[in-house]
C-alpha cells in the first residue's frame, strides 16, 4: 500500500491526473482533476489509496490526508464505491455532508450523485459521529469560497451559455473548474476542449 506519491503532474483529464515519479506515470483518479491545473509540470505530493480488483489495480489520489480519510469513510458504507465517493467529495460542500450525517438529513444526502434514500440512511447509520472535516485544505471548502469569488469562471459560463451550450453540460464543467483561478478566456478554451471529447 502507498501513503502518498511525490512527483510531477504531467497530464490532466476530466477523470484523472498523471503523476510521473522516477520515470513512471501513475494514473490517479481524483475528485476534481482541474483543481490541479495550476500545478502541471510542477512537483506535488498526492495522498493515494490503492484499490485492487480482478481486472484492474486503481489508484485514487487526494490533496490532503483529510480528504483521503473522508474517502475511506465513504467507501466503508455499503452501496458506495470509489467512483461514488469521489463524486460526493467533488460536490460543493463537504462540511455540509458531515453536518447532514450528524443531523440525519436524508434529503440533503440524496442530492449527491447515485445516492438514494436507502444508501443515505446507511451513511447516517455507519458514519454518524465518525466523520470530521478537520482540515482547511479540503478542495470542496476551497471550491465553495472560490465559487463565490470567481467572477472569471462565471463570465466564461455565461459566454458559453450565450453560444448555445446546454446549462446541464456547463454545470458539470463548472464543477471541474471550481477551486481554480484563471481568466475567462482560458476557462472557455479548456471547456471547449472538454466538450469536444
From Swiss-Prot:
InterPro entries to which the protein is assigned, alphabetical: DNA_helicase_Holl-junc_RuvA_I, Hlx-hairpin-Hlx_DNA-bd_motif, NA-bd_OB-fold, RuvA, RuvA_2-like, RuvA_C, RuvA_C_sf
Region described as Domain I: spans on this chain: 1-63
CC terms in the record's Gene Ontology section: cytoplasm; Holliday junction helicase complex; Holliday junction resolvase complex
Compartments where located: Cytoplasm
Key words, A-Z: Cytoplasm, DNA damage, DNA recombination, DNA repair, DNA-binding
Region entry Domain II, spans: 64-142
Coiled coil: none
Lineage: superkingdom: Bacteria
Classification via SUPFAM superfamilies: DNA helicase RuvA subunit, C-terminal domain (SSF46929), Nucleic acid-binding proteins (SSF50249), RuvA domain 2-like (SSF47781)
A matching Pfam family: RuvA_C
GO terms of molecular function: ATP binding; four-way junction DNA binding; four-way junction helicase activity
Any single GO BP term: DNA recombination
Principal location class: cytoplasm
UniProt-annotated stretches for the region Flexible linker: 143-147
Segments for region (Domain III): 148-197
Record's keyword annotation contains Nucleotide-binding: no
Domain notes: Has three domains with a flexible linker between the domains II and III and assumes an 'L' shape. Domain III is highly mobile and contacts RuvB.
Role noted for this protein: The RuvA-RuvB-RuvC complex processes Holliday junction (HJ) DNA during genetic recombination and DNA repair, while the RuvA-RuvB complex plays an important role in the rescue of blocked DNA replication forks via replication fork reversal (RFR). RuvA specifically binds to HJ cruciform DNA, conferring on it an open structure. The RuvB hexamer acts as an ATP-dependent pump, pulling dsDNA into and through the RuvAB complex. HJ branch migration allows RuvC to scan DNA until it finds its consensus sequence, where it cleaves and resolves the cruciform DNA.
Family membership noted in the UniProt record: Belongs to the RuvA family.
Subunit architecture: Homotetramer. Forms an RuvA(8)-RuvB(12)-Holliday junction (HJ) complex. HJ DNA is sandwiched between 2 RuvA tetramers; dsDNA enters through RuvA and exits via RuvB. An RuvB hexamer assembles on each DNA strand where it exits the tetramer. Each RuvB hexamer is contacted by two RuvA subunits (via domain III) on 2 adjacent RuvB subunits; this complex drives branch migration. In the full resolvosome a probable DNA-RuvA(4)-RuvB(12)-RuvC(2) complex forms which resolves the HJ.
Name under which the protein is recorded: Holliday junction branch migration complex subunit RuvA
Organism for this UniProt entry: Streptococcus pneumoniae (strain Taiwan19F-14)
